[in-house]
């Protein structure tokens, strides 16, 4: 059997001159010179090669094809008279002896230029994703994703973890987001759910006697899109360890991740073990965020006490937080523009003042703070050319977090950009008051072990302590201001589990009903265990230097959770609904 090709389009060099070769690919570009000469740029997965068409019959074939048609070229390699140093194969060209059409592009014009597809409208890019992915710059992100996943698998295997797949069809459980439900044809009125995470299965593996588990796990959550979150599905490096503590988990990831980030990242510098550990409350107080970007050296100070009787109503009696930015060269216009950006992100108005060359407070709200300059100087650096940005009010903490990230990124002397800076956020609150319910709810993972175990839960039950003061043995991994993962030491004791759920108004029967397998397994003797699940998509997004997670997913949905290339979601035939015992009630969105 003859080979389809002898070389790829990135392989031939000047040393190959005179060789007979066969290459295949897409016609990226055709440039005709007069009526008897054409230059064709042939592109495959690996690169491009110039083909010089001089034969009349071959010219006729080329002229009858549209760009992006696929062809096979048999011919001879010759050295170019005019070389192109920007191209890997720029020293040579192929003179064909035979051209064969493999697949015609039947359209005279394309939805966008392949090599400029990133400039195209996102809807067009998603609809014609198979064309978008022909762009080497777009394709490179997918290649990077493959390389990172392979490196993660190798590293986890080296650390003694077994890759075990867990079910995709499972039971619905209250894990935070909405489930994707799958009707069970053989069980009318009942549904499977696609797993939001393999949380229960991986804990059950630990109770089954496995010691170290991992998988590149698909997770399905019916939630809205964000820049760093894709709707529908995502993938995570899911891992769990039996007879393990928080420190055991930290040790594995602190060994696995830095080499991968340094090797594959836009920057080649990454934190080394041990990563900095910051308690949740400290992170919120110092950075206004539980996802601090430690490349930025700015922190905030709470100066509320100085403004209890301020003349400025926006500060008077409010929570007031300030960030001092020394040696700041931003102009007034730049400051105002950044403040406007921050207000859009945080939903709260922010303010500023500066210390001029003479050490005097000026600009912005300076006249309202100059009276407490001496007191401010005890907590802020107020040397000449210092800018101070101010957040005030009910949402001051959120607002100041946005100010730190926005102004920090704008001031090069406060932003060590070209590195990957990891940190652990630890000691999260176990409970919170729900925004919608107004009642006590789990803050994050309901399966976390509370710090203090049963004793602290009983104290809360008796009213001796506020449940909001209970902390979980839970942790987040953050890199460059992006949350990569949440994890926890698990609550493996069924009695402690029930007591933890009782505080959020779920009794023993509720726990047994919602988590029957895990509860029963724990009753047969469970090991203390811990785990975490860094998001693969977010990691690759960081490594690629992309701001949108859709850029590193081969076939992403749009912001409205639609796959406009495949036409999903879509209506289905009535016969299918009848088989599943489903009736559509209410208005139905028509297919486009």
Give the label of every model feature segment.
Residues 1-592:
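Class II aminoacyl-tRNA synthetase catalytic cores and aaRS-like
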